[in-house]
A protein has these predicted regions:
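Glycine-enriched loop-and-adjacent helix/strand subsegments that border the catalytic/binding cleft
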Residues: 1-138, 144, 199-202
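Generic structural signal for buried aliphatic residues
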Residues: 30, 153-154, 180
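Conserved S/T- and glycine-rich ATP-binding loop of Class I adenylate-forming
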Residues: 32, 150, 184
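Charged, cofactor-coupling segments
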Residues: 68, 77, 83, 87-90, ...
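A conserved acidic, glycine/proline-rich C-terminal tail/linker
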Residues: 133-175
Length: 203
């Protein structure tokens, strides 16, 4: 799906709690940033279009998303209110030591991925487990359309990289005042505080 490029938040930038939702969730993803324009990019050539990698928090309103997905259409209000990126962009050559080849599907990166809420670790997995490779994702995203410089391609949420994947009641939905930290080394930590819709923190 396509997200909203007008609602991008950087590292340490607070994210307002969406007023229409009661079920705010984080999503822990690795993101590739496109560095060359291209259309109908072949999987075998796709990595040459990546300028760098960063951490991607694909915030989601699960109650809105659940209602909207019944129509199987998009983009949707459960996804278009915020995307957090950062803290830095790491170039592909800087991650070469973590790259592993998965023929014939392309490359994956052995990067530990963790998520913490208010200092408690809730998610701990690895980017090497991502289902689709970035080669496959870029080839699909560029089919019959043009990828632009600066476009961001998310890996999809790593296993147990969001509250939705835990059994009901195990971990409550996010609230104003919560601090979400997503960590992928050697990229760093993307820290975000959730604030009230008007910018105030919760109790």
């Amino acid at each position: 799906y396509f997200s909203n490029p007008l609602c991008i938040f950087g590292p340490d930038e607070p994210v307002p709690y969406p007023s229409a939702s009661d079920q705010l969730d984080y999503e822990l993803e690795l993101a590739a940033i496109i560095g060359r324009e291209g259309t109908n990019i072949a999987e075998k050539d796709a990595l040459s279009y990546i300028a760098g990698f960063t951490i991607f928090n694909d915030w989601s309103c699960r109650d809105l998303q659940r209602d909207e997905m019944q129509a199987r259409l998009g983009p949707a209000k459960g996804k278009d209110f915020a995307t957090s990126l950062g803290p830095i962009v790491v170039t592909p050559d800087e991650l070469e030591a973590w790259r592993e080849t998965d023929p014939p599907r392309g490359s994956r990166w052995r990067l530990r991925m963790q998520a913490r809420v208010n200092g408690k670790t809730l998610s701990d997995n690895n980017a090497s487990t991502m289902y689709w490779t970035f080669g496959e994702l870029i080839a699909h995203a560029s089919r019959n359309t043009r990828l632009q410089i600066g476009d961001v391609i998310g890996s999809g949420t790593v296993g147990f990289g969001c509250l939705l994947e835990f059994p009901d009641g195990t971990h409550p939905w996010l609230q104003p005042g919560d601090v979400v930290e997503l960590e992928i080394q050697p990229i760093g930590v993307l820290s975000t505080r959730v604030v009230g819709a008007s910018g105030q923190e919760g109790p």
